[in-house]
Amino acid sequence: MNEAHIISAKDYEDLLTYIERYWSAITCEHPKDKFSHFGLPHPFICPNDGIFKDDQFYWDSYFTVLGLVRSDRIELAKGMVDNFIFMQNRFQLIPMRNRWYNLGTSQIPFLTSMIAEVFAVTGDRRWRRKAMAATEKELSEYWMNKNLTEQHIVYRGLSRYCDHYITHLAAEHESGWDMTSRFHDHCLDYLPVDLNCALYKYETDLAEFYKASHKPRQSDAFLVQAEKRQRAMTSLMWNHEFGFFFDYDYKHKKRGTFYSLAGFYPLWAKLATHAQAKKMVEHLERFEYPGGLANTQATGLSEEYKQHDFPNGWPPQQWIVIQGLLNYGYHADAFRIAMKFLSLNQKVLKKTGRLWEKYNVVTGAPGESERYPTQSGFAWTNAIVLWLLDQFSPSKGL
């Protein structure tokens, strides 16, 4: 391990202190419908105390929950999941955040994974039954509903991003990768690797839940659905020659060739075979820099500095790749990337006094942005740093 990436005991404590102190600044309560926000029944964590104050974002919350359960804030984490159950029951979808004008847009679904994090601590089976029922509704009423105007399931049982406005730009917002060169400004035309991995994980999580509930018929139905998705994804998205998963342009019946960290989601979802994983790990060098992983490979397409392209590295994608590597036994690679990202955060905290939404992983500065000023704070960064410190703590080999 490069000495520049070693986290000292003081650095460890400085990061923990900052994160623990910041939770209170971003804990929000918004119980009533008011102005642009609709009310939520439980307190929640917003991304920061800046432009995202009072917003509970969907995909942000998964990574935030990872940190909350590791800082003994289980009731807050459970309340955030309960807020999503409330949204699903009220609106028949989980919007990207708790604002009226976002009711036609969701985000990559992570609710079953949030439920698993909370249940692992509480063991509350009654609560899990209620929560998993909401995820089943979300899957059938939004992501797999062929009767919606904004149809997501479009080709061979696979889904795309598509919000109420049915525009490429709005679909890219639903992806959470706003903006990126991944979709070549035609997001509606693509079956994304990450979205379909998330839906595959819903199906396998629901299959396991029903198996544990002694309901084999329901379990088998979701398992069949998951296996069908896995076969379709392998057929359309896996490039045997390149050894990587790519988004699929179903309008032109063409597999993409643009490398992004979305291609590692099959490791996180445990969809890839071990032979595929071995080939995928060889591509880490395309993305790896001193501060961790860039969201995309450095190519001419991404020289516009779209915020989800090279040279930016986003904390959620670091975690997805690290967890995926751990799932398949690539512990040394996971450790190396984790140390790079922790070291980057430690250095930026020392220099700026804050952690940030995203980073330029080449220079080690807060990330490039063309949409809004890069935000400090930051809930998912803090949570993922906390998770990494716990996972690779001194007792575990940090």
Residue ranges and their predicted role:
Residues 2-55, 79-98, 148-191, 228-313, ...:
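Extended glycan-interaction surfaces of carbohydrate-active proteins
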Residues 56-87, 262-273, 318-331:
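Alpha-helical support elements that line or immediately flank enzyme active sites
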Residues 11-18, 73-84, 125-144, 202, ...:
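Extended, well-ordered alpha-helical scaffold segments
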Residues 61, 108, 112-115, 196, ...:
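TPR repeat positional signature
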Residues 112, 119, 200, 206-207, ...:
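Heptad-repeat amphipathic alpha-helical coiled-coil interaction surface used
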Residues 192-195, 306-330:
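Peripheral, non-catalytic segments that deliver or gate enzyme domains
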Residues 88-131:
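Aromatic/His-enriched, Gly/Pro-containing loop or helix-boundary segments
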